[in-house]
């Protein structure tokens, strides 16, 4: 139940002409200190209409406001503060969670709508680095959140399996590669060749030309070029699949850039039909001068297509195939101009569905204050970080709970969860300084802290068996009330995370719930035999439901024992 809405409805009966219910709801605040109640309405906006001081208006409103749902109404300066009936609210909230279980928090505003989410999208023949973690986990979380809000979600891994870099890689392999060596450790060896190409090209400009020539051969279907490309792609997808399994990430499809090669000429034909193509120094472009942007390059002077051509083609294909209402591109901020050009070209074609398309950028993972770069080899491999995190979790379990069943599985959940939560706990546009030490801490604002809180709550429930269906829940103490208020916010938290494309809204929320529950655990004798025992256990159960579901929305597992 939305209790602020109830407050707004009560106030709207007083302000029948002055403010709409929505205007009232937008003005209602949550006091930072408990002594000022559970909700507050500021009267500043009414001073001009009433020709009275806000404090006087607040007193008059407080006298008129009568509702059994409020145990106390008071005017404090220019604010009308209300205290909700704790027994009524706690009973309603707990019964809702107990009935809905993991469905609690489900929203319906995405019902009968489709969202396409383009995320992860690593490049073939390059290691899966920590730098890929952000797009992968932000996109994965947004997928879960959108599904929770009723959307039909299509999760696409737009693999970087095409482009001039493959001409460079083929050139490097032909010059310095050894088939037997590459077969021993394909991704690492191919990456070494990629880095070597960029080191050598500074002294040998002809290498760049050779790279372009090999990519042209690849586009034209040259047998040797295609065979090498297929090999690079096959080996890369094997590595990616292993890492996605560790992270618990799944996709609807893996349609990479190469998938659209045979569709691009049709799209270029559409641009020609709309008279949007211009020739510029032998290349084909869409002029975006009126929009204040550089021209969007569609085809190079040598006839090769580029990233923008494939993205435009892919967008039309996805709209025709999935009929999306929204399309999110979870890609770094360095691509902002590309997406502005890309969306603008679609608008110039008259496609109204482009209004539902959005670039979802994020900050970088930094190493020593610098962005990681695959070209220069400044790279930390994600798989190595995950393996180390899992090993550390295993050591921790051996020390604290050596008799734990399924230790390896729990260590995987905790280790991977630590890495994922570290990535998602801050607002997505913030840069993250890579620190294995901070990422793997098992206290403070970390994934393992939330997981441990969930496991602690589960351990309490294993000690008692209660039939909640016949109970009426009457919790009034401050510690219980703080948790109930937090649990009641979960549906709105999910809605906010979806609207803002911001998983950190949920990360911060589950940390708040965990911290509030741990205070409760430290101050309340939960299993004492008295009239409120069943209510306390219902509260503990509700906490496990919300923590587990909140972590799931982030892509983090919630073990019941740790």
UniProtKB/Swiss-Prot annotation:
Respond yes or no to whether keyword Ligase is given for this record: yes
Q: What is the protein's species of origin?
A: Bacillus thuringiensis subsp. konkukian (strain 97-27)
Single GO cellular component annotation?
cytoplasm
Q: Which UniProt keywords apply?
A: Aminoacyl-tRNA synthetase, ATP-binding, Cytoplasm, Ligase, Nucleotide-binding, Protein biosynthesis
* Residue pairs linked by disulfide bridges in the UniProt entry: none
| UniProt-annotated location(s) | Cytoplasm
This chain belongs to which protein, by name? Answer: Arginine--tRNA ligase 1
Molecular function per GO: arginine-tRNA ligase activity; ATP binding
Q: EC number(s) of the enzyme?
A: 6.1.1.19
Query: Lineage of the source organism?
Result: Bacteria, Bacillati, Bacillota, Bacilli, Bacillales
The kind of enzyme this is, by top-level EC class, is ligase
SUBUNIT field = Monomer.
Give GO terms for biological process.
arginyl-tRNA aminoacylation
Q: Which family does it belong to?
A: Belongs to the class-I aminoacyl-tRNA synthetase family.
Which reaction is catalysed here? tRNA(Arg) + L-arginine + ATP = L-arginyl-tRNA(Arg) + AMP + diphosphate
Pfam families attached to this UniProt entry = Arg_tRNA_synt_N (PF03485), DALR_1 (PF05746), tRNA-synt_1d (PF00750)
Q: Where is this motif: 'HIGH' region?
A: 122-132
| Domain of life of the source | Bacteria
């Amino acid at each position: 139940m939305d209790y602020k809405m109830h407050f707004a409805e009560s106030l709207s009966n007083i302000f029948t002409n002055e403010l709409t219910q929505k205007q009232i709801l937008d003005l209602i605040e949550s006091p930072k200190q408990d002594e000022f109640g559970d909700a507050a309405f500021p009267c500043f906006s009414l001073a001009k209409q009433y020709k009275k001081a806000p404090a006087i208006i607040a007193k008059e409103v407080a006298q008129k406001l009568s509702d059994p749902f409020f145990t106390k109404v008071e005017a404090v300066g220019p604010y009308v503060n209300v205290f909700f009936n704790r027994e009524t609210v706690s009973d309603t909230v707990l019964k809702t969670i107990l009935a809905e279980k993991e469905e609690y928090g489900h929203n319906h505003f995405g019902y009968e709508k489709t969202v396409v989410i383009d995320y992860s999208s690593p490049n073939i023949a390059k290691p899966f680095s920590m730098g890929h973690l952000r797009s992968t986990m932000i996109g994965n979380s947004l997928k879960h959140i959108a599904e929770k809000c009723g959307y039909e979600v299509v999760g696409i891994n737009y693999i970087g399996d095409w482009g001039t870099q493959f001409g460079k890689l083929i050139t490097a392999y032909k010059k310095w590669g050894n088939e037997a060596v590459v077969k021993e450790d394909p991704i690492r060896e191919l990456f070494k060749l990629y880095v070597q190409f960029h080191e050598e090209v500074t002294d040998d400009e002809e290498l760049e030309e050779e790279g372009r020539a090999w990519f042209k051969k690849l586009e034209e279907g040259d047998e040797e070029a295609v065979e090498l490309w297929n090999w690079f792609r096959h080996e890369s997808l094997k590595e990616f699949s292993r890492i996605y399994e560790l992270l618990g990430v799944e996709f609807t499809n893996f349609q990479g850039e190469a998938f659209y090669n045979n569709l691009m000429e049709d799209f270029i034909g559409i641009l020609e039909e709309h008279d949007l193509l211009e020739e510029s120094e032998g290349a084909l472009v869409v002029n975006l001068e009126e929009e204040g942007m550089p021209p969007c390059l569609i085809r190079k002077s040598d006839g090769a297509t580029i990233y923008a051509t494939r993205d435009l083609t892919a967008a039309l294909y996805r709209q025709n195939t999935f009929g999306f209402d929204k399309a999110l591109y979870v890609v770094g901020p360095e691509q902002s101009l590309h997406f502005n050009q890309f969306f603008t070209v679609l608008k110039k074609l008259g496609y109204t569905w482009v209004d539902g398309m959005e670039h979802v950028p994020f900050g970088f993972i930094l190493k020593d204050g610098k962005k990681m770069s695959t070209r220069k080899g400044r790279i930390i491999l994600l798989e190595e970080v995950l393996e180390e995190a899992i090993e550390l979790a295993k050591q921790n379990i051996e020390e604290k709970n050596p008799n734990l069943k399924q230790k390896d599985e729990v260590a995987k959940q905790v280790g991977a969860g630590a890495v994922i939560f570290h990535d998602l706990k801050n607002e997505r546009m913030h840069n993250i300084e890579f620190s294995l030490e901070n990422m793997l801490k098992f206290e403070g604002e970390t994934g393992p802290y939330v997981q441990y809180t969930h496991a602690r709550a589960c351990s309490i429930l294993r000690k008692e068996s209660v039939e909640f269906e016949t109970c009426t829940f009457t919790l009034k103490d401050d510690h219980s009330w703080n948790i109930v208020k937090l649990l009641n916010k979960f549906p709105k938290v999910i809605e906010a995370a979806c609207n803002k494309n911001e998983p950190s809204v949920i990360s911060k929320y589950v940390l708040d719930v965990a911290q509030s529950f741990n205070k409760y655990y430290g101050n309340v004798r939960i299993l004492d035999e008295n009239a409120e025992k069943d209510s306390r256990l219902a509260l503990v159960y509700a906490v496990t439901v919300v923590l587990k579901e909140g972590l799931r929305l982030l892509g983090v597992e919630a073990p019941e024992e740790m």
